[in-house]
């Protein structure tokens, strides 16, 4: 090869006529076909499904009254998580306690920020699952 050219993923190389050179950029990487959709890993949801298959999903519904107090226990639905940890404790109960503790640790005045409440509960539930099981599930929190 009289004149080597260094190319990277996505570079379009012209070899002839004339001197070789990079002439354009093209899409590169993995492309997935999922059902009738073709796209990147993120576009077709493959990345999230991999995470779901590895660590499961937890949905938490929190209802606050007009004074921003907890109105009953939060509802928790766990999919793909074990029922109990190695000590035999119910993981959903551990996550419920963590959710309630997270809400109660926020001063009532700051509970008006529902995004703050949601993120606090999400982190607490995810942490409780990780302590009990060793994996961090995807956690979705609904606060009303």
Task: Tell me what each language-model feature is.
Residues 1-144:
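Acidic/His-rich, metal-assisted hydrolase cores and their charged scaffolds
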């Amino acid at each position: 090869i009289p004149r080597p050219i260094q190319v990277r993923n996505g570079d379009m190389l012209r070899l002839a006529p004339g001197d070789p050179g990079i002439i354009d950029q093209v899409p590169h990487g993995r492309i997935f076909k999922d059902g009738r959709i073709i796209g990147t890993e993120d576009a077709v949801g493959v990345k999230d499904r991999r995470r779901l298959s590895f660590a499961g999903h937890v949905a938490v519904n929190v209802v606050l009254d007009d004074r921003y107090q907890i109105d009953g226990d939060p509802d928790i639905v766990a999919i793909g998580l074990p029922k109990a940890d190695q000590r035999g404790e119910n993981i959903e109960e551990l996550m419920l306690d963590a959710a309630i503790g997270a809400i109660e640790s926020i001063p009532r005045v700051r509970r008006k920020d529902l995004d703050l409440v949601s993120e606090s509960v999400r982190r607490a539930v995810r942490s409780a699952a990780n302590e009990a099981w060793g994996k961090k599930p995807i956690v979705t929190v609904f606060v009303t």
